[in-house]
Amino acid sequence: MKDKILLYHKNCPDGYGSRWCFERKWGDEMSYIPVAHGAPPPEGLEDKDIWIADFSYPRDILLVLKEKNRSITVIDHHKTAEDTLKDLDFCHFDMSHCGAILSWYYCNGLNKEPPLLLKYIEDQDLWKWQMPFAKEILAVIDSYDYSFRLWEELNYRLQDDQKFSEFLAEGSALLRQREKKIKEIYAKKHTLTVFGEEIPAVNSPLYQSELAARVAEEAGTKYGLAYYFDGDGYVFSIRCGKEKDFDVSAVAVKFGGGGHKAASGFKVKNLKDLNECKVEIPAAERKNHQHD
């Protein structure tokens, strides 16, 4: 393990996009370690310079890391983390950008325009879908492994007009395949009881964002769920439905998770835990949540 360490959000385009920015700047001078949300810090983090991108540890863990290491810098954009860490001077939050864009600015300065690759990542991560041909482009990006060489290739293709057209054609084919699979999975939708309320859900490790959003929108509920069993518990993605003002992160945080207003996640040991909070909340608030 090298003296410079980047810890970044594992199995996430935004997290890997953050790594890509740091690796372009520091190359082999830095160790790059993917970290799953909720997992403890890797062993051996002492006397290091540490950067944490696209996620945050709980406050107590961050303070221990700060005490044991030369420096620590957190670059994050998750609302639920900012609520508890914003007073720490080594934590930097900006809800208007994704982790990869924030990492780009950190590594390159605010005056250097982020590449299209990262702008598309942000469009998906913040659940905006405002970039042209976003679904086609992101279908291609999502089909590639997390590899520095492959992401350099993706970045190059998006900047070349001819290759961009090829990108769109490839994305259209991938979208057809994805939509077919999503329809097959969606047909198995059901409901789960969350704090006494029936919430539409789909059991799938694939296309969780799309499925959670779709079940909510078609059922007309405040939010929808997509989940899968990872061998240790049930991992949930939660997306807002037609009520765009509803803050799904408020639900996720009650199970020890977090995220954004429109897109969040959490994990429970058993499905019956969906009626039990991991964090203490006032009884009146729980009652209000059941009936609002």
Which residue ranges define each predicted feature?
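A broadly used, surface-exposed interaction patch
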Residues: 59-87, 92
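Gly/His-enriched, cation/cofactor- and phosphate-binding structural elements
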Residues: 2-4, 48, 179-292
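Short N-terminal binding/cap micro-motifs at the start of the first secondary-structure element
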Residues: 12-19
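Short alpha-helices
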Residues: 79-148
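Glycine-rich, Lys/Arg-enriched anion-binding loops that position phosphate/diphosphate groups
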Residues: 119, 126-208
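Divalent metal-coordination and catalytic microenvironments
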Residues: 22, 54, 76, 103, ...
